[in-house]
């Protein structure tokens, strides 16, 4: 009984060369909900039962920061495009873990962390105020013997209101397990063809994209509200951002900003996969210079998807680590 769950599919590696749809997963089970995350952890696909439990039908509007895949008749086809859609289904249909089971799950990570010499780590996607509350959860796991320090980044849930989330208390920002910042998502992933890019994605024969140039999942008023909140609370603002089109937008929104943290960068751009030379030059002239975490693991782990998605020029220009290091103190 209960949910059938999985993770890790990449449609470019499947024999069918396409994303599974609800009809495919209905063959797994018609009476149990099925939920499969894509390899990028941004999108997912579910069966008809899961859609029914979440109340998602042709009249359900797309949520903020995501979209529901639909067939030619406007009916949901099972695709949950980007995190906004995934979170909608989780909030409306999936049961939350109990506090005890969540603590036990964290404690199981002890041997894994220690075997790799990891004593400090970061969770970039916690939902502050959820049940169980992340900070309480991680602190309890550490109290019971998990010997790891945790920096938690709370996903922004305040919308366009800079007071839309409660301010951090001083005790939440101190100690070996603490909140370290706020997380935003400006776009999707390159392998999933949802990162916001200037040049349209390549498509396979017969493939039709809902968003040929990806999708922005962040709007300026929301960004400015989160920026104001981070400044007021003295924490870092981290932005998931992959495509050059989304980088253009965020640089526009940051153009007049001043830094507010002294010891660490006030803003982090996570991934910055397609960062153009003119954008690097622009950043070099800004008062607030964001830091970069441009992980080159993606072209190795997902190179087939990147090859299938990007033009040769964009593929060869992705993750310009050397250019960033030479141009910026990043």
Where are these regions (language model features)?
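Generic hydrophobic alpha-helical scaffold/packing signal
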Residues: 110, 139, 227, 251-255, ...
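Non-cysteine beta-strand/loop elements that form the S-adenosyl-L-methionine
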Residues: 176-194, 288-299
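Divalent metal-binding segments
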Residues: 1-165, 184, 191-246, 265-266, ...
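Aromatic- and carboxylate-enriched substrate-binding clefts and catalytic-loop regions
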Residues: 265-276
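Secondary-structure transition/capping motifs at alpha-helix termini
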Residues: 140-150, 170-176, 232-233, 255-265, ...
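Active-site-adjacent C-terminal substructures of enzyme catalytic domains
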Residues: 274-330
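Distinct, well-ordered alpha-helical segments
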Residues: 134-137, 162-168, 247-259, 281-282
């Amino acid at each position: 009984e209960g949910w059938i769950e999985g993770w890790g599919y990449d449609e470019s590696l499947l024999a069918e060369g396409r994303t599974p749809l609800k009809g495919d997963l209905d063959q797994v089970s018609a009476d149990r909900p099925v939920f499969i995350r894509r390899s990028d952890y941004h999108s997912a696909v579910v069966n008809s039962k899961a859609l029914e439990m979440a109340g998602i039908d042709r009249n359900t509007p797309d949520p903020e920061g995501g979209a529901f895949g639909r067939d030619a008749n406007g009916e949901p086809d099972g695709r949950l495009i980007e995190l906004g859609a995934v979170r909608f289904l989780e909030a409306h249909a999936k049961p939350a873990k109990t506090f005890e089971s969540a603590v036990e799950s964290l404690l199981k990570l002890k041997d894994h962390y220690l075997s790799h010499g990891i004593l400090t780590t970061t969770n970039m996607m916690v939902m502050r105020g959820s049940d169980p509350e992340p900070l309480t959860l991680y602190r309890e796991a550490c109290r019971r013997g998990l010997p790891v320090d945790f920096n938690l980044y709370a996903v922004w849930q305040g919308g366009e209101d800079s007071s839309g989330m409660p301010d951090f208390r001083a005790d939440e920002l101190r100690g070996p397990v603490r909140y370290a910042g706020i997380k935003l998502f400006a776009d999707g992933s390159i392998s999933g063809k949802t990162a916001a890019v200037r040049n349209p994605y390549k498509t396979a024969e017969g493939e039709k994209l809902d968003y040929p140039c990806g999708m922005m999942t962040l709007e300026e008023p929301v960004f400015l509200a989160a920026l104001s909140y981070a400044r007021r609370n003295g924490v870092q603002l981290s932005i998931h951002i992959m495509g050059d089109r989304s980088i253009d937008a965020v640089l526009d929104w940051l153009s007049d900003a001043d830094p507010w943290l002294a010891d660490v960068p006030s803003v982090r751009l996570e991934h910055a996969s397609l960062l153009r030379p003119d954008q690097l030059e622009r950043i070099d002239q800004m008062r607030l210079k964001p830091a970069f975490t441009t992980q080159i693991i993606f072209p190795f782990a997902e190179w087939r998807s990147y090859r299938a998605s990007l033009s040769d020029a964009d593929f060869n220009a992705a993750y310009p680590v050397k250019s960033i290091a030479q141009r910026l103190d990043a």
